[in-house]
Structure formats: C-alpha cells, structure tokens
Amino acid sequence: LMEYLLKNTTDKKERAYLLNHYLDSFKGTVYRQTQFAEYEMLTNKMYEDGESLTADNLSSVYLELNKKYYGSDIISDEHIAYEWARIPHFYYNFYVYQYATSYCAAFSVAHKILEEGTPAVERYKKFLSGGCSMAPVELLKIAGVNLETPAPIQDALNAFGEIIKEMETLVED
C-alpha cells in the first residue's frame, strides 16, 4: 500500500508525510523492538551472572542502550533511563525480536510481489495456505524469504536507507 501511495502522489507535502510515516513505522518496529530485545538479553545476562537487578542497574543499562541506538546526534534526556519500567513487553519473556524479523519478512514478501508479480503472489498464497503446518521460518521459505540468512533484514535496512535519502532530498528542495 505504501509503495502504491508513494508512486501515485504528486504533492510534495503528502509525499513527505508518507515517507515520514514509513520511516517512523520502520524505526518503531525494527529498531526499537531490536533495542528492547537487546535490553532483555543484557538484563537476563546480568541475572545469570549474579548481578543485582535493581532499578538503578536496569535504568543504567536502558540509558546506555538508548544512547547506542539513537546515536550521539540525539540528546538523551536522563529520564529516558526509566522508560523500561513502563514497557509492557517486558512483563512477558523474550519475544519482541519477532516484531523486527516479521516486519523485515513482510517487507521482503511485499517487494518480491512488486518485483516478480504473479509467481511471488502464488508463493505467498502457498505460504498462507500452509497455516501452522510447519515452523514459521520454514513456511516463509515457501514465500521466498529465508530468515536463516541476513538477506531479508539487510534488504529492509537498505530500503530504509534509501527512504531516508529520499526524505533528505525532499526536505532540502
């Protein structure tokens, strides 16, 4: 849908809005959920290593990850360190990475459909008809997406980079 909307808009402001929405969706699903998954991994390792899981320790880890993920160009308000305490994803064990991988898999399927047409649509239908007959990673292979390789994630990240470049060009004009 996003590709269709971008292809068919001639209004610069609408295009900027669509690109921003695309980027924000990508950032929130791929980068932020990966950040959350890394936070869970690090805090679980702290526990396994016998470290105390105090609010100060958990907040410190979260703040450092926030700085890592947002980079030095973004000023991190020190209060962001406490955000971990209000994120419901952390009430249940490690699963948020699936948001990022699923987004990249869906991105890959959609782009295969746009590039290949009918053959990719047929593979997608076969994937859908597979239901729960096998593991999701195996079902995705039917659709032409192999999450056991870095390709789907790298392709999505490359596209994200291109969308950023387009947005930068658009706002410079």
List the predicted regions and their residue ranges.
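C-terminal, non-catalytic "cap/extension" segments appended to globular domains
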Residues: 1-13, 37, 44-173
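Short beta-alpha connecting loops at secondary-structure transitions
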Residues: 18-25, 46
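Hydrophobic transmembrane alpha-helical segments of multi-pass transport and channel proteins
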Residues: 26-30, 93
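Core active-site phosphate/anionic-ligand binding loop and the adjoining beta-turn-alpha structural block
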Residues: 31-39
